[in-house]
Amino acid sequence: MAKELRFGDDARQQMLAGVNALADAVKATMGPSGRNVVLERSFGAPTVTKDGVSVAKEIEFENRFKNMGAQMVKEVAAKTSDTAGDGTTTATVLARAIVVEGHKAVAAGMNPMDLKRGIDKAVAAVTKKLQEMSKPCKDGKAIAQVGTISANSDQAIGSIIAEAMEKVGKEGVITVEDGNSLENELAVVEGMQFDRGYISPYFINNQQNMSAELEHPFILLVDKKISTIRDMLSVLEAVAKSGPSLLIIAEDVEGEALATLVVNNMRGIVKVCAVKAPGFGDRRKAMLQDIAILTAGEVISEEVGTSLESATLDSLGTAKRVVVTKENTTIIDGEGKAADINARITQIRAQMEETTSDYDREKLQERVAKLAGGVAVIKLVLLPNRMKRKARVEDALHATRAAVEEGIVAGGGVALIRAQKALDGLKGENADQDMGINILRRAIESPLRQIVANAGYEPSVIVNKVAESKDNFGFNAATGEYGDMVEMGILDPTKVTRTALQNAASVASLMLTTECMVADLPKKEEPMGAGEMGGMGGMGGMGGMM
């Protein structure tokens, strides 16, 4: 396919046009007084949003070179969202500010590579300063404040996220679902829960809750199908003599084995329940091993040379209580050793760092949560705009996790203004690198300027006043008041601010050092002309039909 090329300043101008157009749309949503953006939908009513990344995802341009610039900034927003869960608008505004100032310097004849080196040096200094300024986010009040700010000042969301994190801990999994009531609800699942229920309803012993409840059960873990009762006779006899109940977790239990277990359960010989093992393939094996460590048992598997016929009570795990419903199994207070569980968590975390798949990382995080803390489910109030609200809660959840991970700094753009001090006295190796440092110095004022502008105030006046002040003194755009941002509950996760700055500077530097752009030439569609009808030959033989 034929290509179209752009070089030098022409290429950068086209990119800059795309960056400006996308940033103009996204920046309108920034801050507590951010404006709404209306997005057209193919079907139904348009969507109204204040979420910067949602706006960015919708934007594409017909001009391919302009579109490349926009897509690169869109990548900044997406990467920041993936890493820190928030800060997409901040990253977009910062990237635009660096690109605009940098483009002026390149147009004036400065060396793009030296500008990049100066910007990188300044980013490293500002990042270090942010980490020095960061304070740990430990108490529920700070977590609630971070969640509230990220959820566009919705205090109900901030409070319920803080409550959820308090109950399941920072390692716990918190999920968001649509509720059926008129109030937000928080449901906490204690212990390890997986999405497999009883194989047969004849295992139910609590008719009111339609569940099988086992107190102090032995837990048999088998990595294969169980079809014949002969394989597990020795285990059943041992449990019948010394244990009150038995939970069997296997790939499947069927045929004669299932029928015998049901009969034994109904006659009261052995209180038993059988469930299928969670997951599939290698993930099933890993989750069975998790359960084994949690309950101080072992997985009966031919791969490691153990068989069901030779299993003894020592092979079985134990727990304080197990509740099995039609859809879920919950193991409460497994008897596993804390040291073994912590070692398993460390091992899974190492796998999380190595994997490149977001899906795999999410599943590994769920396994950590089930071993370490628990699972909390936030059920949202039934409202017409619940999809928009659900996205807002998920953003706030990511922000609070980031705050717990790396701490918090003063919000509202104040932390970046304070971090400017790290650039005082910082020098590059030449004048062009010094210009790169100054470009970043001016660019990190842009988030505060945009927040103030969206609130309807004069940015220059407020930025100067905040810059001349100390510590956490800043401007509350929601109320129009000056004061201590931390005391006013306006906080940003350090990770969000740091990630937004680093990603913005990285992509902006790429743009400034771009010398050529290559795009496909659009295909010219041929006009659909009327084809020749041709003759009606071959009709002469129809005379014989007379």
UniProtKB/Swiss-Prot annotation:
Induction: Not induced by heat shock. InterPro entries: Chaperonin_Cpn60_CS (IPR018370), Cpn60/GroEL (IPR001844), Cpn60/GroEL/TCP-1 (IPR002423), GroEL-like_apical_dom_sf (IPR027409), GROEL-like_equatorial_sf (IPR027413), TCP-1-like_intermed_sf (IPR027410). Its main location: cytoplasm. It catalyses: ATP + H2O + a folded polypeptide = ADP + phosphate + an unfolded polypeptide. The gene is groEL. It is an enzyme of class 5 (isomerase). PANTHER family: 60 KDA HEAT SHOCK PROTEIN, MITOCHONDRIAL (PTHR45633). Gene3D superfamilies: GroEL, GroEL-like equatorial domain, TCP-1-like chaperonin intermediate domain. Forms a cylinder of 14 subunits composed of two heptameric rings stacked back-to-back. Interacts with the co-chaperonin GroES. ATP binds at residues 29-32, 50, 86-90, 412, 476-478, 492. PROSITE patterns: CHAPERONINS_CPN60 (PS00296). Together with its co-chaperonin GroES, plays an essential role in assisting protein folding. The GroEL-GroES system forms a nano-cage that allows encapsulation of the non-native substrate proteins and provides a physical environment optimized to promote and accelerate protein folding. GO terms for cellular component: cytoplasm. This is Chaperonin GroEL. Belongs to the chaperonin (HSP60) family. The keyword Isomerase applies. Its EC number is 5.6.1.7. The keyword Transport does not apply. GO terms for biological process: protein refolding. It comes from Legionella micdadei. It is found in: Cytoplasm. Keywords: ATP-binding, Chaperone, Cytoplasm, Isomerase, Nucleotide-binding. One of its GO terms (molecular function) is isomerase activity.
